[in-house]
Amino acid sequence: MEAIKTARLPGRCRSCRTHRVYPIDVRKYPGIADTKTGKAFLAIAPNKSEENMQKIYDILNYAAFDQPNEANLTAKDLVNDFGGAKVKEAWSRNVETAEKYNDPGTFTTLIGWEWSSNNRGANLHRVVFMPQGGDVANQFIPYSALDSDDLEDLWAWLDSTSEKTGADFVAIPHNPNISLGLMFAETRLNGEPVDAAYARERMKWERNIEITQIKGDSEAHPALSPNDEFADYEVYDFALTPDGARPAPTKADYVRSGLKTGLELEKKVGMNPFKVGFVGSTDSHTGMSSAEETNFGGKGSTTQCQKNEHIQPVSVPLKVGIWEQQDGLAYGQKVILSQSLFDAFQRKEVSCHYRSAYNSASIWRL
């Protein structure tokens, strides 16, 4: 949440051992400090030492999975203590900020959020955005994984909210590579097989997919494409579980094999649920663009560069060892407006912007 300050001293993610994390300083926010979660945090971590921040991060990680933790918190506690009015307040601030800085044709903002489903450690996150402004966005509270971690429930909510408010939505799945075999699965989360109705709903909302970002590349894996010498490009296989497990890759985790599965399903059910365009992203959650070498925002607060630090090609010490190269996005449209951006995504006239020695992008239409 934008207005909640982060602690100055970070902990480290147990999954990768290097990713720095920044739990909130609950003492500054009575609405959180007075909750069961807030009181537990204050008792366990009375100061903002790195050791204490690590404790808080570990508690959040284990509580989210309803696993034993030092504070005896559950996932339900987190929902009760961080949901409700706090979500509405944060959403209103985000909408207000987007409206404030929107300058159509010069700097176009889009209102959206991340539906962060983490089904048993499987990354099923969807980034959702809309072309409409605050007058529409303030008519609803974003649907989150706290409401449901089943993507079909998200689609149903998008359907009903679109009908009620007139909002149009685009949902983009990201990080298939750590989806634990669920992103391109032939079986739905409810155990039923993928059918034509499922395929229609998925293609209605999810016409593109993220193929590469800082948490690795999702196009291919050397174990699945042994004859492709480039399939080992930026492999990242840490699951989003507290123990940082590294499960074996499956064909349902990677775009190349997922496209093939889609063609097979089209023969079976009459429609392809995985006929998607490709985008590349940062997943930095900073809001800073990194499209210019002379104005590089970094992959996060630990890798931000000072002014002019990267004007010349130099060797920069690695500050965060787990992240891969972040990527960019291009789209096929002459005018940078929120509606034209939305339309380009609907047409799948978007691109994966692989980063290398030079900035380059291609537009794909599938």
Give the role of each language-model region:
Residues 1-366:
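Extended, charged catalytic domains and RNA/DNA-binding interfaces, predominantly
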